């Protein structure tokens, strides 16, 4: 058994050290670089010597990132919910990479809110999240694929453990399940072009995707706009307990995001990137096992975590 463990370790070590050549000449385009994973990845790839094309949502974020890095990083503005913005960014990337193409596209831009019990949300709440996390990701990918194919590079899509098991209502898990399906389908389609597609499925990390507004205030707004009949069916205790549970989840969220950034980097620089990366102990020990259990078992476990509504049977 010890020998098998050693062989497994050596195999993983070899794969992790088996890097692509000429990294300093390769271009990487990353969305969502104002803060969080995208911002840190951009800086880490610059330190590695790669040519980084970073897309930010705000001018402030763009200027700050440019100040914090070197000439190897260039920034542009991108709103992934607007087709014209995506087209402009694609042309900007095309002008930068030229005939060599784009080595890696990293679809990192994302939002997590609004989230909550599905019945408390509106269609617009779902659309707001899905347009960024899924539709925007798809449109960016479609515009960048010719350049990635030219370089025989890779696409790295930011999903989530919530793309394997739906642990919360709202558009977040819905969009991440969509990211998984889209990534799986294009990975198979692009195989013969020599393009690899990787999916990052982090556990619960503390990033700006959770928003700046106080959680209880956000949940109170959702609660107070509900019809009285709906509020009565859940009860005030449900609202209080549900909100407290969300607070607890956020409080135990992992603040050290280095594992996520290293996973993203490995997907970009390794000759043998993995199809899926699951950074975070909660991803490995909780969410992925829950996703693999029989559905009735997963339902039983997760439903026991939810509070019981006033009108429960």
UniProtKB/Swiss-Prot annotation:
Substrate binds at residue 160. The keyword Phosphoprotein applies. Keywords: Cytoplasm, Disease variant, Ichthyosis, NADP, Oxidoreductase, Phosphoprotein. It is an enzyme of class 1 (oxidoreductase). Expressed in the skin. Expressed in granular and cornified layers of the epidermis (at protein level). Highly expressed in liver. NADP(+) binds at residues 29-53. It catalyses: a N-[omega-(9R,10R)-epoxy-(13R)-hydroxy-(11E)-octadecenoyloxy]acyl-beta-D-glucosyl-(1<->1)-sphing-4E-enine + NAD(+) = a N-[omega-(9R,10R)-epoxy-13-oxo-(11E)-octadecenoyloxy]acyl-beta-D-glucosyl-(1<->1)-sphing-4E-enine + NADH + H(+); a N-[omega-(9R,10R)-epoxy-(13R)-hydroxy-(11E)-octadecenoyloxy]-acylsphing-4E-enine + NAD(+) = a N-[omega-(9R,10R)-epoxy-13-oxo-(11E)-octadecenoyloxy]-acylsphing-4E-enine + NADH + H(+). GO terms for cellular component: cytoplasm; intracellular membrane-bounded organelle. GO terms for biological process: retinol metabolic process; steroid metabolic process. InterPro entries: NAD(P)-bd_dom_sf (IPR036291), Sc_DH/Rdtase_CS (IPR020904), SDR_fam (IPR002347). The active site is at residue 172. It is found in: Cytoplasm. Pfam families: adh_short. It comes from the Eukaryota. The modification Phosphoserine is found at residue 185. GO terms for molecular function: all-trans-retinol dehydrogenase (NAD+) activity. Its main location: cytoplasm. Belongs to the short-chain dehydrogenases/reductases (SDR) family. Plays a crucial role in the formation of the epidermal permeability barrier. Catalyzes the NAD+-dependent dehydrogenation of the linoleate 9,10-trans-epoxy-11E-13-alcohol esterified in omega-O-acylceramides (such as in N-[omega-(9R,10R)-epoxy-(13R)-hydroxy-(11E)-octadecenoyloxy]-acylsphing-4E-enine) to the corresponding 13-ketone, the reactive moiety required for binding of epidermal ceramides to proteins. Displays weak conversion of all-trans-retinal to all-trans-retinol in the presence of NADH. Has apparently no steroid dehydrogenase activity. It is linked to Ichthyosis, congenital, autosomal recessive 13: A form of autosomal recessive congenital ichthyosis, a disorder of keratinization with abnormal differentiation and desquamation of the epidermis, resulting in abnormal skin scaling over the whole body. The main skin phenotypes are lamellar ichthyosis (LI) and non-bullous congenital ichthyosiform erythroderma (NCIE), although phenotypic overlap within the same patient or among patients from the same family can occur. This is Short-chain dehydrogenase/reductase family 9C member 7. It comes from Homo sapiens.
């Amino acid at each position: 058994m010890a020998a098998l463990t050693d062989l497994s370790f050596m195999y993983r070590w070899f794969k992790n050290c088996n890097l692509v050549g000429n990294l300093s000449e390769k271009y990487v385009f990353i969305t969502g670089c104002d803060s969080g994973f995208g911002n840190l990845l951009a800086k880490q790839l610059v330190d590695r010597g790669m040519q980084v094309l970073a897309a930010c949502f705000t001018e402030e974020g763009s200027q700050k990132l440019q100040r914090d890095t070197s000439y190897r990083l260039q920034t542009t503005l991108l709103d992934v919910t607007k087709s014209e913005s995506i087209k402009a960014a694609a042309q900007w990337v095309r002008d930068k990479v030229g005939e060599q193409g784009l080595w890696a596209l990293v679809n990192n831009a994302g939002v997590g809110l609004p989230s909550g019990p599905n019945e408390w949300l509106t269609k617009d709440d779902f659309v707001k999240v899905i347009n960024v996390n899924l539709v925007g990701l798809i449109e960016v990918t479609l515009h960048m694929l010719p350049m990635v194919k030219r370089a025989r590079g890779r696409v790295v899509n930011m999903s989530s453990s919530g793309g394997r098991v739906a642990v919360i209502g709202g558009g977040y898990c819905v969009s991440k399940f969509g990211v998984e399906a889209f990534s799986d389908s294009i990975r198979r389609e692009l195989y013969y072009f020599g393009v690899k597609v990787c999916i990052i499925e982090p556990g619960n990390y503390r990033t700006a995707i959770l928003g700046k507004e106080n959680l209880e205030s956000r949940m109170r707004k959702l609660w107070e706009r509900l019809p009285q009949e709906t509020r009565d069916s859940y009860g005030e205790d449900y609202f209080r307990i549900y909100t407290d549970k969300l607070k607890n989840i956020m409080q135990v969220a992992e603040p050290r995001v280095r594992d996520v950034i290293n996973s993203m980097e490995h997907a970009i620089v390794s000759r043998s990137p993995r199809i899926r990366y699951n950074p975070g102990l909660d991803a490995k020990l909780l969410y992925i096992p829950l996703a693999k259990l029989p559905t009735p078992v997963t339902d039983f476990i997760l439903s026991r975590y939810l509070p019981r509504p006033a009108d429960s049977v």
